[in-house]
């Protein structure tokens, strides 16, 4: 028995060790196979050959994802671009792009609140208007009222603009001018000091009349906010986590009628800028967003011998809540016929003004104005000192002299000065608009809009053609007519003079206080 007992007891460890060795083998097998499985899975994920993904057929790119171009292909792309000697401002980037956003319409519907619209008066081409429109669509603008003339009203440009969801194109026809000639504005005093003058004054009156019409359109469309912007300006909705203008205006108190966006001015660092929205990242801050001591303490350095702190205006732009009796108060502000609007000024958000960002802007502005290049005559045509000086230079100097003047007065080439003013906070880097517009371009949004528009029949080609027949003289009639048709029951406060473009505070402001 003892032997049997000892024999049986000695066999127990052998029986118990069998399951232990089996589990160890399984664990070893698992540890061995798991890395191999993960490696195989990773290989399958990054494998570029063999399988044909039907989704990739939607893309016209040979490579569907960024990073899938070989070194040899990159060299050939660079060679082809350099050989052509031109840059495709509207088309696809020469680098690979993510293909699934092509035909991205940004067709916002009425359920998105608040509903925001922008109105502008423009003669710019597609290379400027398309990035401008789609950038503002990205940040939450749903509707655009484009009062077009010149290049913007040409058939090749207008037919593209008409196909964009949310864009309303208004041509400067004789019918429009006759309608605006009957505006109540001509019987009021707040804009009267700008009547009967050429160039910038004429444009200022025209913008105000267009803004008045845009208010009516915005009311009919159920818009909640309206903003007047030029096509060389972008809203910068800083201060919101989502970089959203809709979020920004949605948080405004219900008793606020007007929201003022201080403007920042572009500070270009090269004289060969082609596409400002994608190439300019440095801006000069507005007085309203700086400490007083910082502003005046660095005023001379920031001005660099120019007439004012900003090259052009410094009083920003404004968004108005769409409501009864709203009226424009010049291109920069809004007013109300029945009350003084409750205004707030934003502490972080701004309007980015791309001021003379291209050397060619000197001559293009000159060509739009028939003013004589004398110090006396330019005061009739331009409101701001820098515009006057730029017009005289563009009208009298040689190309070499113009370029030298442009480099001295507009381009920031002094690296030490830039670094100093960046540290002081006078200058700042803003990359969001650049990134958004570059991504839209690389996604093929702009090129697909142009291609789609030219494949479809034009909606209003006859209107565009008739617009091109309107002479400059008939257009100038807008600033010279005054039709007295209304007896207005308005108080004196509602007749406050229109707010023109104004320069920022100068050093004389501190001397006056002393």
Swiss-Prot record:
Glycans are attached at residues 156, 187, 251, 460. Residues 458-473 have a biased composition (Polar residues). One of its GO terms (cellular component) is plasma membrane. One of its GO terms (biological process) is response to abscisic acid. InterPro entries: KOBITO1-like. GO terms for molecular function: glycosyltransferase activity. Residues 1-23, 457-514 are annotated as: Disordered. Residues 1-39 form the signal peptide. Keywords: Cell cycle, Cell division, Cell membrane, Cell wall, Cell wall biogenesis/degradation, Cytoplasm, Developmental protein, Differentiation, Glycoprotein, Glycosyltransferase, Growth regulation, Membrane, Secreted, Signal, Transferase. Involved in the coordination between cell elongation and cellulose synthesis by promoting the expression of genes involved in cell elongation and cellulose synthesis. Acts as a regulator of plasmodesmatal permeability. Maybe a glycosyltransferase. This is Glycosyltransferase-like At3g57200.
